[in-house]
UniProtKB/Swiss-Prot annotation:
The protein's name: Heat-inducible transcription repressor HrcA
Function comment: Negative regulator of class I heat shock genes (grpE-dnaK-dnaJ and groELS operons). Prevents heat-shock induction of these operons.
Gene: hrcA
UniProt keyword Transcription regulation present: yes
Gene Ontology molecular-function annotations: DNA binding
Organism: Desulforudis audaxviator (strain MP104C)
Amino acid sequence: MGIDERKKQILRAIVLDYIATAEPVGSRTIARKYGLGISPATIRNEMADLEEMGYLEQPHTSAGRIPSQRGYRYYVDELMEPETPAEEEKLIIKTNYQAKVKSISEVIERTGQLMSQLTSYAALVSTPRVTGSTVQHVQLIAMGGGKAMVLVVTEPEKVHTRVIDLPENITAEDLETVSRVMNAKIRGHSLNDIRITILREIYLELLRHKAVVEYIMDLIEDSGESTEDRVYLGGILNILNQPEFRNVEKMKTLLSLLDQEALLSSLLAEQAGQEEGITVLIGDEFKCDLIQGCSLVSARYGVEGRAVGALAVLGPSRMDYARVTGLVEYLTRNLSRVLEKLYR
């Protein structure tokens, strides 16, 4: 049996009412509030059919119905239209991103705070994984005592330094020569480009200073491989205040999840690997048992080919999907624009 138009209208009304009230929904409520032009008796029969089809559930203590996971999934895929953020919300987002930013981590934290504030759920934002960071400058600075400082600047304006022991008989003029040749060869190139096409040329030209070149390349490699994901988590109290998590055991399970940064990082890394657009995971669609009873609305953000991360909103399955997906989509676009400016 398929879902006809009348059943779709009733299912949509039940999902919306349950999202708003967290109370099981009865046929009289649907008839009174949603103007479907159908009698309570007819609605009751349709609700029984929807329950038999697996789209609704009936809690033991109530005659009303609530959406099942399958019901939420059908609503998200077939019945929901993302809501455009209100003008006031757009202004809040615009104002936050116009403020002067000192670092990418500050942008990430600000985004997480915005998401949790605007959605009233928990917000997760992973730091962008740099996939094509380019080298902007290399310099060797003599320190005396047979030591030098290697300085490498990668885009966007990230400075990496390391003190090295110099080979015997190397002069300040030699250090300047190595710095000049390295800059001429690798400035503006990604680590991958340097490995594949440029490194052999550098070794041939600086054969006498191979040991120093290797020190520089070690630091460049380390700076380029610094891709450990960090996760900003905000709005924990928002989600704990939801009726679903007033149960102590459910609260403990959720807190256990939120305390595992590696797990959250893995979850967001998976979302960052998805195609562009919004991803909605509901209930047991998660691979992790700790997230049962929750939903995650996520999207990837970033500068293609350079840095990619993910942002997400975590809430109960009874999430306001239309509002959250609209906000996540809008925030993703704005965050990506900010990062594009930082990575110029």
